Amino acid sequence: MNEYKIKLGEITNGKNSFLFEIKGQFFEAFTLSDVEHAEIIATALLDKDGEKLALTLTIDGKINKLLCDICTEEISVNITAETNVIIKITDEDLTSTDEIIYIKKSENSINLQQLIFELIILNLPKKQQHPLNDRGEVTCNEEMVNLIEKYTVKQEKSSDPRWDALKDLKIK
C-alpha cells in the first residue's frame, strides 16, 4: 500500500512528521492477524541527519471487535506504544535488524506498513478481557461466564507414576 510509504525526496534535514490513519483495511494485507477493526493514529517522526534517519514511531487508538478471553464477548482495547529505529541509507546490501533498517540509495521511499503492524501486534495485551470495575472485579457478561462454566468438563489432574517417587525426596 502506497499510503504507508514516505518518499525519501520529501524528507528534509531536521525533523519531519507524518500521520497515518490505521483502520480495518490496513490489516487485510496481513493474513495471520486476529485484528480486523481498529481506529489508530500512527505518527512517524523522522529526524534526518545526512544519510541517517532517526525514526520515532508512535501509535495511539483502540482495537475493536476483539473477543474477551473470559466470556467471548466483543470488546475494544486501547493501545498506545512507541518505538525508535535508525534508518541508514547506503549503497551496500545490508540486512536490517530490529534497531537499524538499511535502505539502498536506489530506493525512493520507506514503507512503514510492516513496522506499524508489528508495533500494534506486539503491544496488544496478552490477556484480552473486559476492564475491571471500581472494586477490581472483571466486568464480563455473567450469563456467558455461567454458561461456559456449566458446559466446561472438569478434568482431574493425574500424575505420572514415574515421577511420583521424586515427590518424596527431601532437598537440602
Where are these regions (language model features)?
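A positional/architectural concept
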Residues: M1-C68
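Charge-rich, low-complexity linker and terminal segments
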Residues: M1-E10, I89-K172
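Short cysteine clusters
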Residues: C68-C71, C140
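Cys/His-rich microdomains that often coordinate metals
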Residues: I75
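Short Cys/His-rich "knuckle" micro-motifs
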Residues: N78-A81
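Short beta-strand edge segments in extracellular beta-sheet folds
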Residues: N84-K88
